[in-house]
């Protein structure tokens, strides 16, 4: 039974239901209540903590907000600013909101009772903002000078409403103030089950909004990829602010979603979207006889002569079509000799025409998901001027090509990403990318207009749901009290790394059957039934080799409570 149904079931035999407010009806987008003060500045935080301590020491009953702000240390601050921050930081506890709405329709009398220094008008405003229907009454300790924990506020409630203790159910999250305090007044109370306290403000923000997501895919995008996308875009924005004359270009397809998030967070800014790929650029290098750069553009795997020719936008002599060439550990002389025998690609000039039309200038920012900086390398050689790379991650090739002042990296302190990240990187790329086929090349049409050619690719509904969740995170963050607060890189990537190493059954179901492109089309983690592999061990090896999320493959193939992530990483050492 979910929480909403539990509340309605518990309330069925009572005429009236009263609720605690904070952490019951309402949650805040901060890990602890005083975290809101810290968002308002360190000086205010120190003064506000001191003022409340002094106000409580000066009297025995509950204090009011006015009494707190009457302390000399808060003389230069306005209570209205704190009230505005409280209003901005509040979020409905969605299961409780749903229960309150149901109970209202059933004709129950509904009240709230809170130990709080905020005035009742402020609490009413926060409840309205969170979507709660009008309550039949509210009782706040600072109004009456008595608290729940002593039982006296509950007794005052019964006196004011004329209800008997037997008519009322009280629901709250505190055993001491809510359950024990209500019992002192003879009132039945139910302790609201609560999750562990959030680790930080970002976690509180996510937890408060997860119940509002419309599908499992949206929830995954919101909680796992939303913080990463927002944090990366914050970092991009800071770099652009340092050099406002430089334009920001996001690379297709990998940075499609990141560009959407950037525009959500910073709608006033213009950016570019470069529809380029290593494959789309390769014809220009083949035409120029730049064999070393053609090799850099080619995928690092074994391909046939026909596959290499197609990749470079040309045809292969029949006698070379079936020749196998290892591009991961290439024989450079043999490869150069092969490339010399390929005809000049017809589309080579269209490559430079497309780039010329984009208005790229020296020093402009190039935003990429990143590994070895290959696309930046290719573009710089074609454009014949330097760009400034901004990558999400990097491998150990990057610093052999670009210095830190030429290409910056967001994750892992700019160092090569760890094995666990690469174990899930193909999945990350798929989830962030525009859900269209790869950029294959360019065609020059009448009037010199260059048309981009892309591969056919059917839309994947799960990708759309996940990306919708990421966009919803960005919009919610922009409109929240946390907007402007940086999300640290290590905090931003942590949910994704947890998913890669220890996915839940639901995450495996959502993601495992997705496919990725990697010189071919491969499943992320789609094993056949375990029983099939017991009689076909070679098939098991082939399927495992093809899986691009091997930890997920193992967990789906043999669903036992084993640390597959740790086992896989040990095997990779």
Predicted regions and their residues:
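A short acidic, amphipathic alpha-helical/loop segment
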Residues: 6, 95-102, 125-126, 181, ...
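Short, acidic loop-to-helix structural element flanking the phosphoryl-transfer center
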Residues: 62-67, 71-112
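Active-site neighborhood of HAD-like aspartate-dependent phosphohydrolases
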Residues: 5-50
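Substrate-recognition "cap/lid" segment bordering the active-site pocket of phosphatases
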Residues: 111-113, 117-168
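Long, low-complexity, Lys/Arg-enriched
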Residues: 155, 159-161, 168-171, 179-180, ...
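Conserved phosphoryl-transfer catalytic core
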Residues: 31-59, 292-309
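Hydrophobic transmembrane helix bundles of membrane-integrated enzymes that assemble
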Residues: 2, 89, 124-126, 131, ...
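Short, surface-exposed acidic
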Residues: 42-51, 73-85, 131-139, 167, ...
């Amino acid at each position: 039974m979910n929480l909403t149904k539990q509340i309605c079931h518990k309330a069925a035999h009572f005429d009236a239901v009263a609720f605690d407010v904070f952490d019951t009806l309402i949650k805040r987008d901060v890990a602890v209540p005083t975290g809101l003060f810290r968002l308002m500045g360190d000086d205010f935080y120190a003064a506000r903590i001191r003022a409340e301590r002094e106000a409580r020491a000066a009297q025995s009953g509950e204090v009011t907000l006015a009494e707190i702000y009457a302390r000399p240390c808060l003389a230069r601050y306005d209570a209205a600013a704190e009230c505005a921050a409280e209003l901005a930081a509040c979020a409905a506890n969605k299961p409780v909101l749903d229960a309150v709405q149901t109970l209202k329709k059933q004709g129950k009398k509904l009240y709230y009772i809170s130990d709080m220094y905020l005035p009742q008008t402020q609490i009413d405003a926060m409840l309205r903002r969170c979507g709660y229907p009008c309550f039949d009454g509210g009782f706040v300790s600072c109004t009456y000078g008595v608290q729940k924990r002593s039982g006296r506020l509950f007794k005052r409630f019964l006196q004011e409403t004329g209800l008997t203790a037997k008519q009322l159910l009280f629901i709250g999250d505190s055993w001491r103030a809510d359950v024990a305090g209500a019992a002192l007044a003879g009132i039945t109370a139910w302790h609201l089950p609560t999750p562990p306290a959030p680790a930080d403000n970002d976690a509180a923000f996510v937890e408060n909004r997860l119940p509002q997501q419309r599908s499992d895919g949206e929830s995954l995008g919101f909680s796992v990829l939303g913080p990463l996308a927002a944090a990366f875009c914050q970092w991009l924005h800071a770099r652009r602010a340092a050099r406002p004359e430089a334009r920001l270009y996001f690379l297709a397809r990998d940075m499609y979603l990141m560009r959407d998030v950037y525009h959500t967070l910073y709608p006033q800014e213009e950016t570019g979207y470069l529809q380029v790929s290593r494959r789309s650029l390769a014809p220009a290098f083949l035409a120029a006889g730049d064999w070393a750069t053609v090799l850099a553009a080619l995928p690092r795997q074994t391909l046939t002569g026909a596959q290499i020719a197609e990749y470079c936008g040309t045809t292969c002599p029949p006698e070379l079509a079936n020749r196998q060439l290892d591009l991961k550990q290439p024989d450079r002389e043999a490869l150069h000799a092969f490339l010399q025998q390929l005809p000049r690609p017809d589309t080579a000039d269209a490559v430079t025409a497309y780039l010329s039309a984009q208005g790229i200038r020296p020093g402009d920012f190039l935003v990429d998901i990143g590994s070895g900086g290959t696309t930046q390398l290719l573009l710089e050689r074609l454009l014949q001027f330097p760009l400034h790379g901004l990558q999400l991650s990097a491998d150990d090739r990057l610093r052999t090509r670009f210095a830190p002042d030429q290409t910056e990296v967001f994750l892992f302190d700019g160092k090569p990403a760890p094995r666990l990240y690469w174990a899930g990187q193909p999945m990350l790329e798929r989830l962030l990318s525009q859900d269209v086929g790869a950029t294959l090349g360019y065609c020059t049409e009448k009037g010199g207009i260059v048309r981009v050619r892309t591969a056919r690719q059917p839309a994947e509904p799960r990708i759309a749901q996940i990306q919708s969740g990421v966009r919803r995170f960005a919009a919610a963050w922009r409109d929240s009290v946390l907007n402007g607060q940086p999300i640290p890189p290590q905090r931003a990537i942590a949910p994704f790394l947890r998913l890669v190493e220890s996915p839940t059954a639901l995450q495996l179901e959502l993601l495992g059957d997705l496919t990725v492109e990697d010189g071919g089309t491969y499943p992320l983690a789609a094993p056949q039934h375990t029983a099939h592999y017991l009689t076909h061990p070679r098939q098991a090896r082939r399927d495992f080799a093809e899986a691009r999320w091997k930890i997920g493959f193992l967990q789906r193939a043999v669903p036992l409570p084993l640390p597959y992530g740790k086992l896989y990483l040990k095997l990779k050492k």
